[in-house]
Curated annotation (Swiss-Prot):
This is U3 small nucleolar RNA-associated protein 6 homolog. It comes from Homo sapiens. HAT repeats lie at residues 121-153, 156-188, 304-335, 488-520, 524-557. GO terms for cellular component: chromosome; nucleolus; nucleoplasm; Pwp2p-containing subcomplex of 90S preribosome; small-subunit processome. InterPro entries: HAT (IPR003107), TPR-like_helical_dom_sf (IPR011990), Utp6 (IPR013949), UTP6_C (IPR056907), UTP6_N (IPR055347). SUPFAM superfamilies: TPR-like.
Length: 597
């Protein structure tokens, strides 16, 4: 092995000598490169091989290549690239070949190889890398697409790209993505040929090229792919995706029309078809010769387009009265409603239309809970409180057991400054399961804090603590304690703490809050701090090493602390803490003793 490593290092010497001779690297730097290269060579030549060693080797060589480039730019020297860079690139390719042969299944390794070749190697080399990768990973359509796009865009070889797509489709005859990219590629190829022909005609050059046949220039190959693909892959979604691609190419108007007509003929029972047809009306310009120029005229024109869209949607919900179809309709209305406009006329029309469609869909009970929320939130954002409340009320009628729906309704009522909010909170709790009520209790308490007396707010917290049990009550207790300190100061917070100190479960934060409140007082009482720590350790002393450490620091740093208690606290901690917590405590204590914590 030593002989192989020595031989490979000797192979490097000519390039390293050149680097030193032309002044890109100093003698000391060359020695450092040789030492590092020896270490890397050893790791990839030993009997037990690790992928990370190959990756590190390649990364080092890439860093070296980039450094050489930067130094060349700095001194303005561009010669000897064959002896230097090309030699390094060739060596890296060899390492990649070994690694990809050993770890064939690692797609990321292959992609790194491809990325390296794109930047540093020749196009011929990259073509071979793609072939080797696809021979092993033929089951991954994305890799076929990547290779074909490279052939088309970088090598400018549409024939090679076409052959790759055809091979890929033999492996994946039902892959929509492959058909879409192949379809796009043929349209791009036709567009490129049209531009070439146009340039030749401008230059008055008579070039005979069979590729310039009228069929190819019109996108006949793309049409064949379209026909074959839709016979295999059913559904409006795929059809629409092909139409969207075709619309990117101005010359393919006939193809666009055929796809559009087929979509309407074959998929009338799919909401996506109707949705697409309706939205297409936004793109169709007015038939009048004069385009609108004033802002008002433009707003009127946009309004007309939206009316045409809605006419299609109205026909759609009559033909296909399903939840999915109504979802498309209300989503369109909501998108237009939230679209920014300076026209009061247009905003008013959009609001009116959205509410009309909502009422119809609600009456038929063909909207999901998510759509009630979406619509109500949007209306609330734009301060249409009356309409937002209408939607929220309708939503709670249908989804009485939804906590978020009730919360939304109550949020709208709070924004509207309704006098019946407390009563409506009570009503919500009648319909909801206790386990989903926590956000509503918190909302009630927050609203009460701003709108009601301190006694009323405390009554809400006390009610909530009786109703909310388990882990949810932990959050509520923390909120209650925070409110007590905000509204009544330390005295009130301590009273609340005392009243709750036996009402398990707790969180560590509950006790830490009280410790912090105590420390914020002018006459900070160390006895109280010890009490809070002791209560916290009773609950969490077997698992929380930080709590023990903080207790010891408090005794050491507080003016009224007793440093002599630290030894006893340490031994108590060692008895109570278990497993990893005990190890963590010992490590933290040692760091503290040495002044590192």
């Amino acid at each position: 092995m030593a002989e192989i490593i020595q031989e490979r290092i000797e192979d490097r010497l000519p390039e390293l000598e050149q680097l030193e001779r032309i002044g890109l690297f100093s003698h000391a730097e060359i020695k450092a490169i040789i030492k590092k290269a020896s270490d890397l060579e050893y790791k990839i030549q030993r009997r037990t091989l690790f992928k990370e060693d190959f990756i590190n080797y390649v990364q080092y060589e890439i860093n070296l290549l980039e450094l050489i480039q930067r130094r060349r730019t700095r001194i303005g020297y561009s010669f000897k690239k064959d002896e230097i860079e090309n030699s390094i690139v060739h060596r890296v390719q060899g390492v990649f070949q070994r690694a990809s042969a050993k770890w064939k299944d690692d797609v990321q390794l292959w992609l790194s190889y491809v990325a390296f070749c794109k930047k540093w190697a020749t196009k011929t080399r990259l073509s071979k890398v793609f072939s080797a990768m696809l021979a092993i990973h033929s089951n991954k359509p994305a890799l076929w697409i990547m290779a074909a796009k490279w052939e088309m865009e970088d090598r400018l070889s549409s024939e090679s790209a076409r052959q790759l797509f055809l091979r890929a489709l033999r492996f994946h005859p039902e892959c929509p993505k492959l058909y879409k990219e192949y379809f796009r590629m043929e349209l791009m190829h036709a567009e490129k040929l049209r531009k070439e022909k146009e340039e030749f005609e401008k230059a008055s050059m008579d070039v005979e090229n069979p590729d310039y046949s009228e069929e190819i220039l019109k996108g006949e190959l793309a049409w064949i792919i379209y026909k074959n693909s839709v016979s295999i892959i059913k559904g409006a979604e795929f059809h629409v995706s092909l139409l969207s691609i075709a619309q990117l190419f101005d010359f393919a108007k006939d193809l666009q029309k055929e796809i559009y007509d087929d979509l309407q003929a074959l998929h009338t029972d799919d909401p996506l078809t109707w949705d697409y047809v309706a939205r297409r009306e936004l793109e169709i310009e007015s038939q009048t010769e004069e385009q609108p120029t004033t802002k008002q005229a433009k707003a009127v024109e946009v309004g007309r387009k939206e009316e045409r869209c809605c006419a299609v949607y109205e026909e759609a919900v009559k033909t296909l009265p399903t939840e999915a179809m109504w979802k498309c309709y209300i989503t369109f209305c909501l998108e237009r409603f939230t679209k920014k406009s300076n026209s009061g006329f247009l905003r008013g029309k959009r609001l009116e239309r959205t509410m009309t469609v909502f009422r119809k869909a609600h009456e038929l009970k063909l909207l999901s809970e998510c759509q009630y929320k979406q619509l109500s939130v949007s209306l609330l954002c734009y301060n249409f409180l009356r309409e937002a409340l209408e939607v929220a009320v309708a939503g709670t009628e249908l989804f009485r057991d939804s906590g978020t729906m009730w919360q939304l309704k109550l949020q709208v009522l709070i924004e509207s400054k309704s006098p019946d909010i407390a009563m409506l909170f009570e009503e919500a709790f009648v319909h909801l399961k206790p386990q989903v009520c926590l956000p509503l209790w918190i909302s009630w308490a927050e609203w009460s804090e701003g709108a009601k007396s301190q006694e009323d707010t405390e009554a809400v917290f006390k009610k909530a603590l009786l109703a909310v049990i388990g882990a949810d009550s932990v959050t509520l207790k923390n909120k209650y304690l925070d409110w007590a300190y905000r509204s009544g100061g330390y005295k009130k917070a301590r009273a609340v703490f005392k009243s709750l100190q036996e009402s398990r479960p707790f969180s560590v934060d509950f006790f830490r809050k009280m410790i912090q409140f105590e420390k914020e007082q002018e006459s900070c009482n160390m006895a109280n701090i010890r009490e809070y720590y002791e209560r916290a350790l009773r609950e969490f002393g077997s698992a929380d090493s930080d709590l023990w450490m903080d207790y010891m620091k408090e005794e050491l740093n507080h003016p009224l602390g007793r440093p002599e208690n630290c030894g006893q606290i340490y031994w108590r901690a060692m008895k109570m803490l278990q497993g990893e917590s005990a190890e963590a405590f010992v490590a933290k204590h040692a760091m503290h003793q040495t002044g590192h914590l």
